[in-house]
Amino acid sequence: MTSTRLSPAFDRSRSVSRQRRNSRRPSERSTASPVDPRADSDNQEPPAIPEEISEIKRYEDFTTIDWVQDAVYEQSRRRAKRRSGSGFWDQEGIFGWRRKMYESYDAGQSWLVVTLVGMAIGLNSAVLNIITEWLSDIKLGHCTTAFYLNESFCCWGAENGCPEWKHWTSFWLFNYVFYFFGALLLSSIAAVLVKSFAPYAAGSGISEIKCIIAGFVMKGFLGAWTLLIKSIALPLAIASGLSVGKEGPSVHFAVCTGNVISRFFGKYKQNASKTREILTASAAAGVAVAFGSPIGGVLFSLEEMANYFPLKTLWRSYFCALVATSVLAAVNPFRTGQLVMFQVEYDRTWHFFEFIFFIGLGVFGGLYGAFVMKWNLRVAAFRKKYLSQWPITESVVLAGLTAILCYPNMFLKINMTAMMEILFRECEGGHDYDGLCQPQNRWSMVFSLAIATILRTGLVIISYGCKVPAGIFVPSMAVGASFGRMVGIMVQALYESFPQSAFFASCDPDVPCITPGTYAFLGAGAALSGIMHLTISITVIMFELTGALTYILPTMIVVGVTKAVGDRFGSGGIADRMIWFNGFPFLDNKEDHVFNVPVSHAMTTDPLSLPASDFPVREAEHLLNDNRFQGFPVVEDRTSKILVGYIGRTELRYAIDRARNQGMVAPNARCVFTKEAAEAAVARRASVSQHSRSSDTFDAIQRSAGASFVDFSRYVDDTPLTVHPRHPLETVMEIFKKMGPRVILVEHRGKLTGLVTVKDCLKYQFKVEAEEHTLAATSSPEFAALGGHLNNPVPETLEDRLWRLIQTVAGFVSGKVSGRPVRLRDRTVPRQSEPSGIPERRNDDAVVELEDREDRPMIP
């Protein structure tokens, strides 16, 4: 069955559902609620006020936004606004200019917000660059003329040495100790700030932002407090020497900036769709200021961050990135005209025989990405299981270990951006760093670069995900740059050994043939592409870093090979892997699923539903208090289960609270969810009270104190998305991706049979993958060696052995220092059969049950 045959079936399913519901209602009765923009203009019900809509649209923490209903509410808000100001909008003449001015302001409000956001992001990035460079250099020495200057500013214009910049002592060992304790101090301050004031400031934030833009609600993750702590702790974490970068956190604080500024404008405060546009544009600006690449930032936002990216969002993302980079260039934090330290320009060309080495760099990038992602997830699981109670200790120990390992290596002890600036350069023009370009030092440099590549890779694996602001872009680029420069030096040595070889026949004799700096540049692009699984945006970012069209083709080849190699080891970059690890309800547009099963295999059967009439209000309140369901299907009665609509948890809670505040709820009051049931209740009340039907309307009953029946029909969605139980699961997942509903109801001939959410789809996907892994494990030789029984004792894992080793070392060290060994207690989180604690019977994905939320490696 193909997708072209499924779409008409889905349309027929919805049309039949509408016809069935309409057939149950008299044609002269309007069923649209006042908050529904589908209501006719002559509807006699009072229009919904904007305050009511804003209350309904408040989403709870760890819930998903229903983009379909959000669009409905936004249209209703606009209609209510037009109705409330109808006299003002109709004015012309002397008052017409006021209307036109207001319309112009409302239309240009988005551009005002984007401009303010871009300016704030650019200014914040410039300040962070200046602070980071000074803190990184202060561990190595100080400026005797001005303590507040870093090494580059202190030595500005110096040609033969720099007497103004002094190391802390003249002894190498004392400088080593000072470097070590400086790293401990900076990392401890960063970890304490994050743990005490803003736990959400830890980590990179890109994976969470992807989920937030897709509609996942995480209150506080983009708040002002997170923005402040992230901006303060990020320079401290980078300057401590940890193998973490600022590019991922730059996206986080940029999106925080966009969220905070947009909240001052009512157009965005109550509109999730509008806010999504600003968040997407802010993410583009964050990448733009991090790499000095405005076009690359826009493409990164398109390729990686947003599931929904219309042309309007593209243009605003471009403008926001333009404003941010313009402000950064105006501040000019490095006083060189460069937006980032490692910008470089190449005036040489490449040769076709170098394609062999370029392909090798691409293979390295793919292998690096697969290796780091695999082992970083193992470290994340270990961190969650054993180290969640000691986030500060973990960060300090990592910083100390990094300082001990990195200081002896000339490429590891300096800042990673400064390292890439050195490795990217051509040797001509006086660009020499500690003999890097000297032929007699060639093989010692190769050895140092190899050590730097290996150590940096290991440090990236154990550092990314610790409880400080930590990105992985620049550390990966640093690994690729050191490996690429090493390859470039060896190729240069090969050429100098065999200059007359036919292999190098295309080289000109009067100019250098091999430029090792270009290999470092391409290696950095390969490693970045390997860890993120991106292609187009990485190519453009690397192009904007060099400004040379000459190296577009080599960059495309390297990135393409990296992508091909990386896909052999699994789909998705590090951000996608962390989303899966944390169990967030996120469906990636880049994934293609083939299950060949109907939606009934993944749906939640027998969901809790509400009868359309005669349902006690007290029972509804108990229902809300006793469970965390985020919505309820409404059926005619619980016996027939004929579907009539759907009401969300927020809507039901607001309706009950509003009725109680207005004194319309009696102790034995009952709620109705359809107009037919409401009118039937009015008729029964009228017959009992012996009033005329014409005078005793339902509105009058509602206005009387202690009404026996309360009408909630205005809060019910009477046309929810529905599918047939035999509808393909793949098509249902596409509906979630393209339309963004919170829940899709499953009905057969009008009868409710179940419901399906994003988490239902993910649960089924994980179940299928687990079965495939089990099948592969049972067919392996190791399984046969165990006797072919699944109930054998589970062998000790690598994480368990590593934890026992840490306990032994900690006990030995504490015993030598204090005389009494201290044993770290076990903190074992029970293994879950599923990636997130999803209850078996629930009504939607609304609440992600993140057990031990503090234990999450990136989301404390």
Model-derived regions, located:
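Acidic, serine/threonine/proline-rich low-complexity intrinsically disordered regions
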Residues: 782-806
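Short, surface-exposed tryptophan/glycine-enriched loops
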Residues: 607, 724-725, 736
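C-terminal accessory/binding modules appended to enzymatic or scaffolding proteins
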Residues: 716-717, 721-726, 731
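A structural signal for short, well-ordered beta-strand elements
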Residues: 613, 722-725, 754
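C-terminal interaction modules of eukaryotic adaptor/scaffold proteins
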Residues: 734-785
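Alpha-helical transmembrane segments and immediately membrane-proximal extracytoplasmic
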Residues: 2-639, 643-660, 664-702, 708-717, ...
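Short beta-to-alpha loop/turn elements within the nucleotide-binding domains of ABC transporters
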Residues: 647, 727, 756
